[in-house]
């Protein structure tokens, strides 16, 4: 499969981003694309950490430190 992509490269687009060469697309296109990719990674990381925190709190729901955390969280809201 690797050689078929190299031999008949009209069927497949080459790499748009490489670390060693200038991007194949104009700056007006790749700068927002890169910004959105970085933004997505940050969003994904934040959601992943929140879900991990929730899972730990669910598993440890009967412990005293979770009850204290919930009380602190509810007290901070209002």
From Swiss-Prot:
What GO biological process, any one, is recorded here?
Answer: cytochrome complex assembly
Q: How does it sit in the membrane?
A: Multi-pass membrane protein
Its keywords, alphabetically, are: Cell inner membrane, Cell membrane, Cytochrome c-type biogenesis, Membrane, Transmembrane, Transmembrane helix, Transport
Gene Ontology cellular component? plasma membrane
InterPro entries recorded: Tumour_necrosis_fac-like_dom
- The principal location of this protein is membrane
Q: Which residues cross the membrane?
A: 30-50
Q: Which domain of life is it from?
A: Bacteria
Q: Where in or outside the cell? A: Cell inner membrane
State the function annotated in the UniProt record.
Required for the export of heme to the periplasm for the biogenesis of c-type cytochromes.
The family annotation for this protein states:
Belongs to the CcmC/CycZ/HelC family.
Q: What is this protein called?
A: Heme exporter protein C
Q: Which organism is it from?
A: Pseudomonas fluorescens
State which gene encodes it: helC
